């Protein structure tokens, strides 16, 4: 039977010359865009699919685009989108491709509009990347907390290099009385080592802890140093407990503390400190603020951030946080593993996370048992 167009949806038709819009065969859809399969190499075919998606994404305010394929184009299409056994694949960064069947001839695939995906990533980014002051200055601290200096400032080694830049600036501006870098070896350590080594070849990072890498970084680049290094912690939980032990062992007074962690993990670090040291005034200042936008049908950062994760890794880290922060039997809160204090998840964040799961599937970072607390 003839193919029926889906009302209100844009369509891209992938087909052979025989199934082109010029064909007289009424069973083939013409679509809003036609990408012809003609035996060219996979990269060229893939680029043409991306181009059609980008064109529709620029003009379409709806949430879905249908890709209709036929004949030999199907196999090329599956390879182009990196099709997986769970029925998903990707058109660049435009979103998930979900399999649907139409009779025996056509396979229809749904793509989530990248503009909505960018917005949802930003919602998660803002929620996870807490900043309690707009800028880390004495004036801001005085205005909000009535203090010119915090007792302690901590940089956690899970951060990207931007965290080192913030710490160095804070040291020069005397934002705190004492400075600590916390971090042994964890799931982000090797990435940090490689970033520093690639950008600053004179800084040797092999086998160093995160605290040692950042210490060498701020010394070499900014000529400053932290007062203390904590080099044994391996995860967000013992980042906090080992830090508190260090403060106690060195008789460091701590009524107020600035926490600076990677933006993806800042909220969890705050919740961890609230569990183990509820009487300390916590000042959150995530190491960066990332804003994601749709650009030419792809997701990109609106401005460069020093040492920033690639987009795929950033999304994976963000999506891994929401199940951890959710206070249920599977989360890290009191109702679950009891690693952190209760965190309230706003409905807007829950909705954004749910929609991102439609785009990326279960793209969350699983906890690595190698870095669990002993």
Question: Where are the model-predicted features located?
Answer:
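Phosphate-coordination/substrate-recognition cap region in phosphate-metabolizing enzymes
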Residues: 1-30, 171, 178, 187-189
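Beta-strand elements within well-structured catalytic alpha/beta cores of enzymes
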Residues: 60-69, 258-260
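A structural signal for short, hydrophobic/glycine-enriched beta-strand patches
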Residues: 118-308, 367-374
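Conserved histidine-centered catalytic loops in small-molecule metabolism enzymes
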Residues: 1-7, 102-118, 309-323
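Short glycine/proline- and acidic residue-enriched helix-loop micro-motifs
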Residues: 26-44, 229
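Short hydrophobic/aromatic-enriched beta-strand-loop microsegments
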Residues: 2-6, 85-94, 177-181, 279-286
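Domain-level recognition of soluble alpha/beta enzyme cores
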Residues: 84-109
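A conserved mid-domain beta-alpha-beta active-site/ligand-binding segment of alpha/beta enzyme cores
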Residues: 293-357
């Amino acid at each position: 039977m003839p193919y029926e167009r889906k009302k209100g949806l844009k369509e891209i038709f992938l087909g052979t010359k025989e199934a082109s819009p010029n064909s007289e065969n009424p069973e083939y859809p013409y679509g809003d865009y036609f990408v012809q399969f003609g035996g060219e190499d996979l990269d060229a075919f893939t680029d043409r699919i991306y181009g059609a998606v980008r064109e529709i994404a620029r003009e379409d305010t709806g949430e879905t685009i249908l890709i209709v394929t036929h004949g030999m184009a199907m196999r090329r299409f599956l390879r182009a989108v990196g099709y997986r056994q769970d029925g998903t694949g990707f058109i660049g960064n435009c979103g998930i491709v979900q399999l649907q069947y139409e009779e025996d001839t056509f396979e229809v695939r749904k793509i989530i509009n990248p503009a909505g995906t960018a917005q949802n990533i930003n919602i998660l980014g803002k929620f996870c990347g807490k900043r309690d002051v707009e800028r880390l200055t004495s004036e801001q601290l005085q205005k909000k907390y009535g203090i010119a200096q915090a007792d302690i400032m901590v940089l956690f080694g899970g951060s990207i290099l931007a965290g080192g830049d913030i710490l160095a600036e804070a040291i020069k501006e005397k934002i705190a009385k004492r400075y600590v870098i916390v971090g042994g070896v964890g799931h982000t350590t090797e990435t940090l080592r490689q970033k520093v080594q690639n950008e600053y070849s004179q800084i040797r990072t092999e086998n160093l802890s995160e605290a040692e890498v950042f210490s060498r970084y701020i010394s070499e680049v900014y000529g400053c140093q932290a007062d203390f290094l904590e080099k044994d912690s391996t995860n967000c939980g013992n980042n906090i407990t080992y830090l508190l032990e260090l403060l106690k062992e060195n008789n460091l007074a701590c009524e107020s503390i600035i926490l600076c962690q990677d933006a993806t993990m800042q909220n969890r670090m705050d919740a961890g400190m609230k569990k183990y040291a509820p009487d300390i005034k916590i000042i959150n200042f995530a190491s960066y603020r990332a804003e994601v936008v749709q650009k030419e049908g792809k997701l990109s950062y609106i401005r460069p951030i020093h040492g920033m994760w690639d987009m795929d890794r950033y999304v994976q880290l963000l999506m891994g946080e929401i199940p951890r922060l959710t206070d249920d039997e599977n989360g890290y809160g009191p109702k679950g593993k009891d690693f952190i204090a209760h965190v309230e998840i706003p409905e807007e964040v829950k909705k954004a996370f749910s929609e991102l799961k439609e785009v990326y599937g279960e793209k969350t970072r699983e906890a690595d048992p190698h870095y669990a607390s002993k």
